[in-house]
Amino acid sequence: MKKYIIILFATFTLYSCTEKSNANNLTEDKTTEGITKIYALKDYQQDFNQMIELLLKKHPQPYAFISEDSLNNLINNQYNKITDSTTMGGFLWISLEVVSAINCGHSVVWSSKLDQLPKSMLFPMNVRYVDSNLYIMDPKNNANKLSAGNEILTINGVDVKTLQKEIFQHLPSDGYNESNKQENVSVYFRYMCAMFYNFPTSFTVTVKQNGTIEKIKLKEAENLEPTKTFLDNCENNLCFDINMESNTAIITIRSFGYYGKGTIFKSFIDSCFYQIKENKIQNLIIDLRNNSGGDPFCGSYLLQHIANKPYTYFHKSIKRYSKLKKTIQPNPNGFKNKPYILINGKCFSTTGHFCSLVKENNLGIFIGNETGGTYTCNDFSKNFTLKNTNLTFRVARQICKTTATTLTNKHGIIPDHYLIPDIDNILNNTDTVLNYTLRLIEKE
């Protein structure tokens, strides 16, 4: 399924285009106009009711992970939080909790106004949660007082564990999956913070460093470019390498999103497996980490090259993908041994589908963290604009399910070797998952 970004919030769809934003480059012409605007109470109520009606009518299974009574209670509670002094940003925060409660990673409500916030309202450092502890990855303009690796204990007086729990309640994900939220909370932290703290004009943190706890008021950021890691090294999303010494090939696929460009993806896969066969490579690593999905035809084409028997991809025929309901034969040039497949919480949508079929048919060995997707998800999403506030509400409209139906829909694919890097390895940019996999190969 294809990656789709509504401003800066990653949701995914089968047939929408990938959009890019330059919001990481903060400028002085940003404004609070719109996000702090107060609409008439009746306008909020009308938009809220419009969103709920669309959610319940368009979504194929809004009660899959929450009972009808529980969802109705939440809807009523959130509706009652709306007052005549609620800002548009506050209304968005209220609405997000309802949409996130159905546990569908392809459904979200968002606003382009968040992309226009002044830098004073955006948390000015790159951070990452490891479990429930929050660490600085890049202090940006605060490097004179803070360092990467310092642990943040509170932000504007709120414990970071409480903050994480609140943000999780407003982040969409599939089922009861938290690995996907754990990854995305770092990506969207500054926007979630802005909403949670009701768009503050400054941030003060208490930080543990050098054995002491300090309270520090943060400087604004000039830019908020994400912290680069080894996972960003595959610039074109498709990379291949052979290590002849260990007789190991590594195929890196950061996206399946080759809609209308399937020949590019197929040529890459054909080339990889041709070289593997020509060089008589016995060990294969397929790195799918941070692959948030894309075209199901791409997922199936990769699967053909590691399958050892015919398979059917989709459980039911799906518009535009009816061929994937038919029996698909393994590729004669495919890999004959079991590959090692590297996964994490950002493996979503089509990547979850691919992994589910590998798991169901025992075609590979998974290493890393639970995937963000599984054998089923909801997609064919459509954007709707709320009448008064102009918030964008994106709702999934169809169930997309592979034939790996013995798996649970509540969680992602669980790795055979569960491995999550600790803060030291993250700070040192050490690829512990790949290194662990290479050691496994050496022991064989």
What kind of feature is each model-predicted range?
Residues 338-360, 365-373:
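Extended C-terminal subregions enriched in glycine
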Residues 409, 413-444:
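Low-complexity, Gly/Ser/Thr/Pro-rich intrinsically disordered linker/tail segments
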Residues 1-4, 18-20:
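Positively charged n-region of N-terminal signal peptides that target proteins for export
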Residues 139, 252-256, 287-291, 317-318, ...:
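Active-site-proximal beta-strand/loop segments in catalytic clefts of secreted hydrolases
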Residues 18-283, 290-292, 297, 312-314, ...:
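Flexible, low-complexity junctional segments that flank or bridge functional domains
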Residues 4-13:
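Sec-dependent N-terminal signal peptides
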Residues 293-338, 342, 346, 376, ...:
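Gly/Ser/Thr-rich loop/hinge elements
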Residues 359, 366-386, 395, 402:
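C-terminal soluble interaction/assembly domains
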